[in-house]
């Protein structure tokens, strides 16, 4: 992991961007690429810094859903069928991201240095979010009629495929997984919960894969990881609280306009500057 590493100010800004954008469906990874490209920040550690601040937002998820996580742990230990089923679906939903992450790590890392790819991916994210304009109201209507969607192996696997796609910068993990879950009939609150709990496993796995890279990191680079992660944790807690309430309000699809504008402007910037 070569390069000069991040200054404290750069790490704080990038950590804040990560924390604020991780839980809104606008692609935190895409915003990190945009910030680095426009402000000319180099030698940031690329995927390593990305995973470090993701671990911080993972802690935010664990804190926010601590009650649900505790009940699942107790349920699994006491072999309660509902808890065992839910954890099994989390494991199944994790498989696609594991397979993609292990088999295409080199390609994925290169895309973090490819601004044009990120701009295009943001446009794709906008299209995914726009589909919830119809699927979210339908899911809420089914819930009101006492017919909530069922979290079965098909739902878990398709949501997992959405998470695997979102490894790429510019594709929103929360946006894609929640959109897929809504399309398959899960209620908004259930879709958000499964999406974020699924993220705990995937992010933990990505962190483990990058731990060996820390051996070659300089003290300045390690310092940048610490500053960025701390900021991401605080910002992530605030953003997660706001996200859940906005999702329940049924305005999820409005984020599509934001990512379309940002993606288009960033693509234009890459064309004018050579990216």
Segments predicted by a language model, with ranges:
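Multi-pass membrane proteins that catalyze or facilitate reactions on polyprenyl-/lipid-phosphate substrates
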Residues: 1-275
């Amino acid at each position: 992991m070569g390069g000069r590493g991040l200054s404290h100010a750069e790490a704080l800004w990038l950590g804040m961007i990560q924390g604020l954008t991780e839980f809104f469906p606008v692609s935190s990874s895409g915003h990190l690429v945009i910030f680095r490209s426009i402000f000319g920040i180099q030698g940031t550690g690329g995927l390593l810094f990305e995973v470090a601040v993701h671990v911080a937002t993972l802690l935010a998820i664990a804190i926010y859903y601590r009650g649900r996580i505790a009940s699942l742990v107790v349920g699994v230990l006491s072999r309660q069928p509902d808890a065992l089923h839910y954890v099994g679906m989390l494991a199944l939903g994790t498989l696609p991201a594991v397979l993609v992450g292990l088999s295409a790590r080199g390609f994925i890392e290169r895309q973090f240095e490819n601004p044009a790819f990120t701009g295009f991916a943001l446009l794709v994210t906008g299209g995914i979010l726009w589909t919830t304009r119809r699927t979210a109201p339908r899911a809420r209507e089914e819930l009101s009629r006492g017919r909530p969607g069922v979290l079965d192996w098909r739902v878990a696997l398709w949501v997992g495929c959405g998470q695997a796609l979102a490894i790429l910068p510019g594709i929103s993990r929360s946006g894609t997984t929640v959109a897929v879950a809504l399309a398959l009939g899960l209620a908004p609150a259930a879709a958000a919960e499964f999406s974020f709990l699924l993220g705990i496993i995937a992010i933990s796995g990505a962190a483990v894969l990058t731990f060996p890279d820390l051996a070659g990191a300089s003290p300045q680079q390690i310092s940048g990881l610490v500053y960025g992660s701390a900021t991401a944790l605080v910002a992530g807690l605030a953003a997660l609280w706001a996200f859940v309430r906005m999702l329940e309000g049924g305005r999820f699809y409005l984020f599509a306009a934001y990512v379309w504008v940002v993606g288009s402007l960033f693509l234009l910037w890459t064309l004018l500057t050579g990216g």
